[in-house]
Amino acid sequence: MNLTLILFLIGILGFVLNRKNIILMLISIEIMLLAITFLILVSSLNIDDILGQTYAIYIIVVAGAESAIGLGILVAFYRLRGSVAIEYK
């Protein structure tokens, strides 16, 4: 439980502190999502419920698809602008 909280807080801090780099923001979102998945997995193992484990596998698959789509959008963004940095005005 404490490990998942620490991982989630690391993800939030990474997202907040790296507001100019889209890749690091995407990685931070993935860390937060995997922390929640790990919490669901550990909780389902503690109560001996297979439904939580299958739900964790489902979350991991969706996170992989999300990462692939996000990186594809980033490649298109890089080709268009030449950089993946966000410029605030």
Swiss-Prot record:
Any one Gene Ontology molecular-function term assigned to this protein's record: NADH dehydrogenase (ubiquinone) activity
PANTHER family per UniProt: NADH-UBIQUINONE OXIDOREDUCTASE CHAIN 4L (PTHR11434:SF16), NADH-UBIQUINONE OXIDOREDUCTASE SUBUNIT ND4L (PTHR11434)
Name of the protein: NADH-ubiquinone oxidoreductase chain 4L
Function, as annotated: Core subunit of the mitochondrial membrane respiratory chain NADH dehydrogenase (Complex I) that is believed to belong to the minimal assembly required for catalysis. Complex I functions in the transfer of electrons from NADH to the respiratory chain. The immediate electron acceptor for the enzyme is believed to be ubiquinone.
Lineage: Eukaryota, Fungi, Dikarya, Ascomycota, Pezizomycotina
Enzyme Commission no: 7.1.1.2
Subcellular location: Mitochondrion membrane
Topology of the protein relative to the lipid bilayer: Multi-pass membrane protein
Alphabetically ordered keywords of this record: Electron transport, Membrane, Mitochondrion, NAD, Respiratory chain, Translocase, Transmembrane, Transmembrane helix, Transport, Ubiquinone
Protein family membership: Belongs to the complex I subunit 4L family.
Swiss-Prot/TrEMBL catalytic activity: a ubiquinone + NADH + 5 H(+)(in) = a ubiquinol + NAD(+) + 4 H(+)(out)
Gene source species: Cryphonectria parasitica
Keyword DNA-binding included in the entry's annotation: no
NCBIfam families: PRK05715.1-2 (NF004320)
Transmembrane segments: 1-21, 22-42, 57-77
GO BP field: ATP synthesis coupled electron transport
Top EC group: translocase
GO CC annotations, alphabetized: mitochondrial membrane; NADH dehydrogenase complex
Top-level taxon in the UniProt lineage: Eukaryota
InterPro entries per UniProt: NADH_UbQ_OxRdtase_chain4L/K, NUOK/Mnh_C1-like
Pfam family of the protein (one): Oxidored_q2
